[in-house]
């Protein structure tokens, strides 16, 4: 007669915490393993070196030429006149989020050419 996984899980669920700890210790001893999590060192550098692939374009100020910035916002986002005007006046505000590096650079150049101050994050 073989015990199924479900029967084992039910037995574990019925155990107290101390009984589970004793069971784990016995399993570690029997199989020569440890339940402690392995510590990996040096992993932080790999994450820091990973290149960012998505960027947010943030309008920080519309500058002196608000009309030109509103036109640039409309062409870049497809917004209507009222929405683009509200966006320009609400700076700092994200114009587009999670865009590629090339699209972010193009959008930044277009808005700066219109007189806006823009950050790419």
From Swiss-Prot:
The family database entries (SUPFAM superfamilies) matched by this protein are listed as:
ClpS-like, Ribosomal protein L7/12, oligomerisation (N-terminal) domain
Could you list the residue ranges forming a coiled coil in this record? none
Instruction: Give the top-rank taxon of the lineage listed in the UniProt record for this protein.
Output: Bacteria
Say what the protein does. Answer: Forms part of the ribosomal stalk which helps the ribosome interact with GTP-bound translation factors. Is thus essential for accurate translation.
Q: Which UniProt keywords apply?
A: Ribonucleoprotein, Ribosomal protein
Keyword Ribosomal protein listed? The answer is yes
The protein in question is named Large ribosomal subunit protein bL12
Tell me the GO BP annotations in alphabetical order: translation
Q: How does it assemble?
A: Homodimer. Part of the ribosomal stalk of the 50S ribosomal subunit. Forms a multimeric L10(L12)X complex, where L10 forms an elongated spine to which 2 to 4 L12 dimers bind in a sequential fashion. Binds GTP-bound translation factors.
Note the Pfam families from the entry. Answer: Ribosomal_L12, Ribosomal_L12_N
HAMAP family, per this entry? Ribosomal_bL12
State any single GO MF term.
Answer: mRNA binding
Source species, please? Shewanella frigidimarina (strain NCIMB 400)
């Amino acid at each position: 007669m073989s015990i199924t996984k479900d029967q084992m899980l039910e037995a574990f669920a019925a155990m107290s915490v101390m009984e589970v700890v004793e069971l784990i210790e016995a399993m570690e001893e029997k199989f020569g393993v440890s339940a402690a999590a392995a510590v990996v060192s040096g992993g932080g550098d790999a994450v820091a070196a990973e290149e960012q692939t998505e960027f947010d374009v943030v309008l920080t100020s519309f500058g002196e030429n608000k009309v030109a910035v509103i036109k640039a916002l409309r062409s870049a986002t497809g917004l209507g006149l009222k929405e683009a005007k509200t966006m320009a006046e609400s700076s700092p505000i994200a114009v587009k989020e999670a865009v590629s590096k090339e699209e972010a650079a193009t959008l930044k150049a277009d808005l700066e050419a219109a007189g806006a101050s823009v950050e790419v994050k």
